[in-house]
Each structure stands twice: as C-alpha cells, then as structure tokens.
Amino acid sequence: MQGEDSFQIPAGTEGDSFPLMEINTGEPHTSFLQTEASEQWDYVLVADHRTQRNTRQAQQQQQFLEELKRKGFHYKMIEDHEKVFFGIRADSRVFDLYRTLLMEPEGPAARVQPTRPTPVPATTRIRIVNFVLNSKTAAGDTLEDLVKRGIFETRFALHKGEEDLKKKWAQWRNMVHTQPIDDIRDYFGEKVALYFAWLGWYTYMLVPAAVAGLIIFLSGFSLFNASQISKEICEAHDILLCPRGDHSRRYQQLSDTCTFAKLTHLFDNEGTVLFAIFMALWATVFLEIWKRQRARVVLHWDLYGWDEDQEEMALELINCPEYELRPYQHSYLRSTVILILSLLMICLMIGIAHLLVVYRVLAAAYFNSALLFREEQVTTAVVVTGALVHYVAILIMTKINKFVALKLCDFEKPRTFSERESKFTVKFFTLQFFAHFSSLVYIAFILGRINGHPGNSVRLAGLWKLEECHLSGCMMDLFLQMAIIMGLKQTLSNCAEYLGPWLSHKCRLMRSKLSPASRDPELRDLQRNYLLNPVNTFSLFDEFMEMMIQYGFTTIFVAAFPLAPLLALFSNLVEIRLDAIKMVRLQRRLVPRKAKDIGTWLQVLETIGVLAVIANGMVIAFTSEFIPRVVYKYHYGPCRQGARPAVDCLTGYINHSLSVFYTKDFQDPVQIEGSENVTECRYRDYRSAQDYSLSEQFWVLLAIRLVFLILFEHVALCIKLIAAWFVPDVPQSVKNKVLEEKYQALREKMRYGRLRPGWGGARPRPDPQQCHSCL
C-alpha cells in the first residue's frame, strides 16, 4: 500500500505540468502541516450558552466529550459571551495506530529516514478526527443526532495557513493562471484537489470543442443569404401556409417566414453532421487523456496503489478496537423495491414534461386571445416562456430529487460511506438527468409529429390544438430551449453560488460586530471560523453534479447548439475561481477526503458520452432537415441520377416538401380570415393530396433516417472505441515508475532477508550474464 502524503517527490517526471494545473515537485508548504507539538485544534464543536444551563443537555455534552477522551482525544472549553467552543485534538497515539494499521509511515520521506519524526499532515488529522466524531457513540448517537437535538450547534475544521491559497488561487485576477493542485491537495485533501484537476483539464479541453462549434456556427452565416432553400422561402409570395395552431386564424405567406428560415440554417446545415462526429471523438479523447492525467497525479501523490476499503477499515478500528467487519451483502428484494421507486420518480419527471407540453398549448391560446403578442411572435413567446417554466421546475425538482435519492440510499443500507456516496450519485444523477433533458427530448423527437393534418388536428382534451414546428423544422425550438436553460443555469447559478455565500457571510459579520470583540487571539480565530458559511457532505458533491449536467448540455443535443462548448468554456473559467474563493474565503474548511480518482463520476461521464452519440444521431436523423435535403438532392431534385444541371441541386425543395390541403376540407367551424378566395394551402408534412394519408415519400424518408441513425451510431461508437484503445489509460512513464517501485521493494526485502539470522550464510552471487540468458 502507498503512503498517505508525499513530502519529497523527484522532479523531472513526465507530465509534471498540466493545463490549468500546477504540480509542485518540492515539499508541501509548511503552513499546511501541523506537528504533534503544536497546540492547534484539529476540530471544533460549538454549543450555545443556553445548553450549559440545561442540565440534561450539558450532561449529554459531557458524556460525548468524555467518550472522546477515552478514545485518545484532548478537548478544551473556550467561552465567549454567547457561544461555547470545544477545541478537539487527537493524541499522537491515534496517529501512531493509524500508521501501524496501514503499515506505512506518512510518505516517502519517513521511509527513507525512519528515525526522523515526521509531522502529521493537517488533512490526515482532520480526516481521522472527523471520522471518529461522526461515528456512533456507546449510546447509539452520532454527532449529527446531537446537533439536530441542539446539544451542539455546529462543528467544523479550522482554516489555518490558507494565506498562500488566497494569493495564488482564490482571486479573480488569477482566472487564466494555472491552479496550484499540490497546495490544494495539502490543504483540502485529495478529493477536492482531484475535482479541481479534473475541472481544469475539462476547461482546457473545451477550447478545441468551442473553436469547432464557433466555426460551424460562423459557417452557417455563409448560408444566411446564399442558401437555395432560404431564397425559395423568401421569394415564395404566392404560397399560402395553413394556420398552424389556435393562435393563428389567417393564412400566412411563405415569404413571411424568411428571417426565421435563415436563422434556422445557422444551426441546421451540412456541418452539423461533422460537428456531431467530432464531439463524439472529443468526448472520448477527453476522458482517455484525463485517465492518463489522473494516473500521473496520483502517482505523484504516492496514492497509485491506495485502497479505500483498507483506509475505511483502519479508521473504524481507530474509532473502536472491537469493530467487526461488515461483509458485502445484496438483497434482491431491496434492489427490486428501489428499482420500482426509481421508475416511479422517472415517470414523474416524464409527467412534468407532459405538463410543460400542456403549458405551451395553453400559453399559445392565451397569448393570442389576450393580444399580448403579434401573431408571428406567439410561437417564439411560447418557446421562451416554456423554457423559463422548465428552468423553475428544474430548481424545484432538484430539491425533491435529492431528498428521494437520500431516502432510497437509506433504505438500501450501504456498507460504507463511500459505497453510500456512490449509490447516491447514481440515483441523484439519473433523476436530475430526466428533470433537465425530458423537455428537450419532447421538442427534438415528439413536437410536431403527432399533430395530424389541418383537416383532422389532434387536440388536447378535444379543445386545444397541439403546437407544431416551424416550417423550417424544430431545430430552432430545440436551440432556443437549450440556450435559455443552459444560459440561465450558468449565469443565475453562478451568481447565486457566489452572492448567496457572500451576502450570508457579510450578514454574519455585521451581527458579530454588535458584540464586544475578544482580546484572546485563540478565541478570535475560533470566532472568525465560526462566522464563515457552514459546509456539509454535499458541498463538493453539488459542484460535481453541476459540472456533470453542464457536460451533458455540452455533448447531448450539441448538434442543435454548437455554441454550447463555448458557453461552457467561459462559464468554467469563472467557476474555477468562484469555487476557490468560496472554499477559501467564504466557507468553513471542507473536511479533507482521501481519493485516487473522481469515483462514480467517471462512469457518469462515460454514460453521457454514449448517450450523446445516440441523441445527436437522432437529432440529425429526425429533427434536422439534413436527411430530407440529401434525399431530395440525389433522388427527386434536378441532380438526380447524376445529372449536372445549371441550377442548384436543391431547387424546388420547398415546393416538394410541403403537402397540399384543400380549404373545403376544414372541419373547424371558426371562420379563417381571408379564406374567401383561397382553395388550397400548404403545410409541413409528407401526405397525399387526395385522402391526406402518409405518402410513399414519408416511408422512404423514414427508412433512410433509420439507416442513417444506425450507421451514424455505429461509426461514432467505433471511433470512440478505437480512440479508447489507441490512447492507453496509464502512461508508460507511470507504469515504469510503479514497476520500479515494486522491484525496489522486492530488492529491499531480499536485502533485509539476507541480514536476518538463519538465512543460511552467504550464497554465491549469480553471474549477471547468466541471469540475462535465462530471460
């Protein structure tokens, strides 16, 4: 097993420098270390003076503290006029036991010079003390239970020695500077450091994706006026469109949709297919190279062979020497119940998406009847307000989903904290995924496909006509929905994420100024930490979840929103410093967690990558007009059968893609404005003009769409698999370093064995040439 922290790491190893992160090759900063001789507290418990006057609560406090004392902890009560602070510090015997159980000193420095006393890193001290404090007492209570009952008000680890991080990292002016990952690790632990290392690498890799998306978007401008389809739409003054919904009671000239059609072609063009394949490859390369970066980082930290189960068992034994191992268990009954309950929650998410559909239908009718918008603006107003309603629904469902996921985890009874965290991650992300993407699925694949035809429209509750896509397709609706939701999440969430803790901290500081200041520096330090915003086990989890949802928006449906990587890039540059400022300046110190990877989040990223291939393939096949344009170009248009006419190959596409409806077949009793001299109108579909049944061309297109989807997904997935195979997860330098360490360990054991009594005396040293000849 590898050591806890590395104090002397050789310089010059391959990959010591990473984009947006900085790996130190020297010893950790001394301000991050605490020796046993120091009088700094590892942890602080806070109680209100009123609990001291309550005999029963004071007795429970004393019982808890005395039990800590029996486990080898020291405590000291420090009072001010309102609060009582209990400083907690572990005895050196606790850390000696920790080293003994893991059979390793604290880092390579201790192994090279075992006689030199090595300081215990503050991250290790806090982690061990936090584990013991939050374990069950002899009475069956946890510290969380005591806090809920008001026996203690709160608990936290102290900020000490964070000045360097404030200067080098937690400032807005450092936005484009590299991150001091080693310093972050020495102060916040490996879990937080890996989060920022991953976030920095993700942000760096967004640069090529953002550039490619911007190129695709700008290339659409070349088609803004030059597109044959746009020209036909803008010049079609003699083609009348059938009313598209209850909000429209008049015939509209096709040329009136000119601007909307041009905007649609910014996103729905031939470059979309190439960009979708590029993003599938990008997602794979991003993950594969991150695995290599992670391997270098954890080897640098001497955690390559660290075992999480062994660590947790060691902490359990430190807390209770009589601890009995909890074996792995699996209950099919519990799993079945959890699966059923999860499916019910997913059905609820889908139900909310249906409610959003109802809202869009009713909003269209209301906006038209109330004359709030002009008729041509109603559709845009419905899309925008629908996206806003969906965003509010996401905020509400996030709280509900977290509560449900926690209850499901409690019911499942995981064996350890890490197992509980992993199961909670899967459940919560699944629910959040459906909450965020259900409406996008509706717009991309359902909107406008179940409406019937003008003479026999499908109606909600028999009253309101379902909304339809624009003549140019649903890509613009999908783009607007994604842009609004992602834009709101990135801007409003970042503002709330910073302003909320900042305002809360300022309010706490203002209230504290009403009380007399203490002259005791120790008490002032405790008060300063107490006035910071509280943290919990979800503090880092929420940051990861936010980035996973953003990654989903950046890859899933990116064919409809090529600017998503660019928006994510700018957002992440702000997010890194925002999180740094929040953790160092505005919040209490996070409890350090040891880790050698980002855990279940890696599987989440891989799942999103596969879903992105499927979703983008379906968007190109069924949502965009790419397939109908290609089929017309080579099967129905002027260029069919290899002809090379003087006109554009898409000439006549608009007239070909619109079906004819005779106005005499309208069943709607409401009089349509200007219908006296109109005998026919056109609508977006492939139907027969005689009986309005689906035409042969519809089925041909459907077959080609399905074939394209299968080919696209297979090609994209093959590219992903080849890229994953071509780029090894672990660099050769890391493999060789690990191999060398194993070899040196065996040589050391061999040397030690030769010195032991009973070895059998000196043996002849084999000829090196003979050793090599045996290979």
Annotate each predicted stretch with a short phrase.
Residues 2-775:
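Intrinsically disordered cytosolic tails
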